[in-house]
Amino acid sequence: MPRYYCDYCDTYLTHDSPSVRKQHNAGYKHKANVRTYYQQFEEQQTQSLIDQRIKEHLGQAAAFQAGAPFNQHMLTFPGAVARPRLPILPTPGMPHGFPQAPGAPLMPGVRPPILPAPGIPGYPGGPPTMLQPGAPPGSMPQPGAPPGSMPQPGAPPGSMPMQMAPLPRPPTLPPPTSGVPGAPIPNSAAPPAIYQTNPPAPAGPTSGAPPAPPTAPQPAFSYAQPSEGNH
């Protein structure tokens, strides 16, 4: 009589009958073996997923190094030249003079350099700094000067552009007074009082003669004169 073989338990049953199989499958040993059997496949699948994620992360880190996307984008244009990478500043733990080959992966603990915004004039990969028409040959704009600045006329080649004179400051106005009628004007805003001294005497005639003596003032009242007929 054939016997039944259990793959999970790796053993043969004594009898090949439905009742014996049901009794064996209900045992705690069989259930533990079934659980262990499927757990090994879950662990293998989980480990394979972890390895795949690590490979994808390493591939993205190598592709997105400092300046890599910008250089790849600029290389798509005809006649474009790859922009050189900025030097990496040494950390306190890195010895001085440590060689860093261009294109090599970054060391652990090293921060990637900060790239300037694309399109800065004068930087490799950005638009060139333009001078005004008529500028002498060999002239160079001052760092930070606006585009189009040029040196002074008659300056030797290679001189810096002329500096613009600062704008005059606006006049200082007194603070506005309150609009309440009858409010006293502060002393600082009131006009200064003008005191008039004795008026100057009128100038004499131009002939050089001495001026006429001043006449005595006439009294404001008069006396009645006696008539001659009474005498």
UniProtKB/Swiss-Prot annotation:
Subcellular location: Nucleus
Keywords: Metal-binding, Nucleus, Ribonucleoprotein, RNA-binding, Zinc, Zinc-finger
UniProt keyword annotation of Manganese present: no
Cellular-component GO terms for this entry: commitment complex; U1 snRNP; U2-type prespliceosome
One example GO MF annotation: U1 snRNA binding
GO biological process assignments: mRNA 5'-splice site recognition; spliceosomal snRNP assembly
Matching InterPro entries: Matrin/U1-C_Znf_C2H2 (IPR000690), Matrin/U1-like-C_Znf_C2H2 (IPR003604), U1-CZ_Znf_C2H2 (IPR013085), U1_snRNP-C (IPR017340), Znf_C2H2_sf (IPR036236)
UniProt superkingdom: Eukaryota
First and last residues of each zinc finger (Matrin-type): 4-36
Pfam family, one: zf-U1
Biased composition (Pro residues): 117-127, 134-159, 167-178, 199-217
Segments of this protein annotated with the region Disordered: 117-231
Biased composition (Low complexity): 181-193
Subunit structure: U1 snRNP is composed of the 7 core Sm proteins B/B', D1, D2, D3, E, F and G that assemble in a heptameric protein ring on the Sm site of the small nuclear RNA to form the core snRNP, and at least 3 U1 snRNP-specific proteins U1-70K, U1-A and U1-C. U1-C interacts with U1 snRNA and the 5' splice-site region of the pre-mRNA.
Similarity comment: family membership: Belongs to the U1 small nuclear ribonucleoprotein C family.
Function as written in the Swiss-Prot or TrEMBL entry: Component of the spliceosomal U1 snRNP, which is essential for recognition of the pre-mRNA 5' splice-site and the subsequent assembly of the spliceosome. U1-C is directly involved in initial 5' splice-site recognition for both constitutive and regulated alternative splicing. The interaction with the 5' splice-site seems to precede base-pairing between the pre-mRNA and the U1 snRNA. Stimulates commitment or early (E) complex formation by stabilizing the base pairing of the 5' end of the U1 snRNA and the 5' splice-site region.
Name used for this protein in its record: U1 small nuclear ribonucleoprotein C-1
Organism of this sequence: Sorghum bicolor (Sorghum)
